[in-house]
């Protein structure tokens, strides 16, 4: 059996949304539709006169369907076709399905059964048997041109003379439990984006990762009921629906009623990048499930940036800016331009140097896969993000020593020249508890990666940002030292003083670089652990006329270092 898909190179890339996707919204309306013309009434009435026997009995009695009948029997689907559930069966004739191919399908089915493959994943059931059967009756007339849902969830176009582009030979053979059609061809099976990654030998690393989180949930509405025994319905065909928690985050690339593009790295690129990304998610030994967290987070860091919802991107073709499913509507920016990124957002994706350059395009049932032998999405565009930690937010204040507690919060009013030059126009004022001490405050820095070089800035604010009449003493610069505390691999806290004593500039918003390309041995991403940053005033008693012991801090910028 052949799996059909279309491949184009980047230069000749084109998209043709076939009728399978275009007509998806009409599927439900098709089921159980009633007559609307005299011709249709006559046709349906004629079919009704033949309603004797089951679909399975009709298959057995038709000498032109022997090979399809053998495959159905070998896969135990004769029980389904002789049951009470109403079905439409589109059976390929022996001219369309030869004896050798039928034998091959039976052998493949039996091999997968022996290997413990679930029926939901059995390729013969999913891609062949269920691809030729639909729930409910779907009689055709001269007016027919609709899309129906097959038992595998695929949408297939049914016209008066074709199904999935293959010619109908006999139509509307009404039986006691449905309808039989004979087809001069096999209905093409088009994989969706998720399925294709498992069928392409160069992409199966992506599939193997995603499929680890597959769960199947029983769906009674799609299952074929049998007898009721001891008050419980026994199902001839139990249909389960794929439920993967990762899809709720990155996009439902497995759904036929959705449209997605996926930039998928080949196995060689996958291996190269996951080897690198694993180093960014090393958790200390105190973190539960640290190995599984490292595995999942490093691979989600790779997969998450390359999936795109067609509806959110104006059809994608010709678009200037492409947003992945993880893109945020907000971008993190600052007045000093330390941070100015739109994460998971890519400019000119089809242009030279764009993320789709050099990729292969594969058109699928619910979108496209762009196969990337050179994965062009940078970690700095996705998970290696700059962040701002506000000193004014109490959840990031760890300990306060020799200072008034709680810290005083100051707001920059709209008439002040510093308005909108400070994140959220609010900052913390750290006032010594008496004139003879140097205050210190330790702040929490969340969600940092291991072995990722960071540039760390402290943003100091002048007194005139909230009081334009501040005295000369209040406007003095600050002098301070700083420490970082983090866990080593064994979960033991390690404290390190940052090099030097820092001084701020007066009467300006001063972003002081505390550390450049600083790397932590452990990761705190998605945990309750924090890196801790202590800011401690360092003004001697003889220096109080030159420096202020009161420190005003808006917060801290943590930016991945770029060489």
Where do the language-model regions lie?
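Mature, structured domains of secreted/extracytosolic soluble proteins
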Residues: 15, 32, 36-563
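Sec-dependent bacterial lipoprotein signal peptides
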Residues: 1-36
